[in-house]
Design a protein with these regions (language model features):
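Collagenous Gly-X-Y triple-helix signature in extracellular proteins
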Residues: 2-202
Length: 202
């Protein structure tokens, strides 16, 4: 990723050392994302994120705090829901800070808790966790338990079983539960995958 500065309308490319010097002058402790251990937090703009996994040249992260608390949407289908749109807005904001190329699109499996696949899968630049991803990262997530319930993408069931009301969520203790899509007001914690070569603040 190239870095530029504009002075009097003239665009000049900065070396990595110059970038780090500028950041240091503003009091930022700037490090490469790839150097941050799983379970540590980093700051990107106003967001504090937990490192969940380092894999090759990418890093999986989740917001430490909720970006909002709200109802899930108009049904228990994540695709196009209110929480889906909030995550997309989060991804757009992140891309403005670190560059679009550094936010990696991932597949969100919308398989229901009972195994039904009515909702298929979607591709997103930021999303909520699925139940499978929560299980994958549970030991890291347990170190950062919020004091409130928060949404996952996974539906309890689907129209095939005449059930479109419930969505999986996580309790303050870290257990799975179910929330009504239009009643429960739960937290939104976006998950994303970023290029691990970027610089972040600690």
């Amino acid at each position: 990723m190239k870095n530029f500065i504009s002075i009097n309308g003239k665009k000049t490319e900065l070396t990595e050392e110059q970038v780090q010097q500028i950041k240091a002058s503003f009091g930022f402790n700037s490090v490469r994302l790839s150097s941050v251990d799983v379970g540590e937090t980093v700051k990107i703009g106003d967001y504090e994120l937990i490192v969940l996994e380092q894999s090759g040249d990418t890093t999986a992260l989740i917001c430490k705090d909720f970006i909002e608390s709200c109802a899930f949407g108009d049904s228990n289908n994540y695709d196009g829901s209110k929480v889906d749109k909030l995550c997309s807005t989060f991804a757009t904001g992140l891309a403005k800070i670190i560059g679009e190329d550094n936010v990696i699109q991932h597949t969100v499996d919308l398989t229901a808790d009972d195994g039904l696949k009515d909702y298929g899968s979607v591709k997103r630049f930021a999303s909520l966790l699925t139940t499978d991803l929560y299980r994958r990262y549970v030991y890291t997530l347990d170190k950062f338990k919020p004091d409130a319930w928060w949404w996952l993408t996974t539906p309890y069931s689907t129209p095939t079983h005449d059930h479109t009301s419930w969505v999986k969520c996580v309790s303050p203790s870290g257990c799975f539960s179910n929330g009504l899509y239009d009643f429960n007001v739960d937290g939104v914690r976006p998950f994303c995958i970023l290029n691990s070569n970027i610089f972040v603040s600690k």
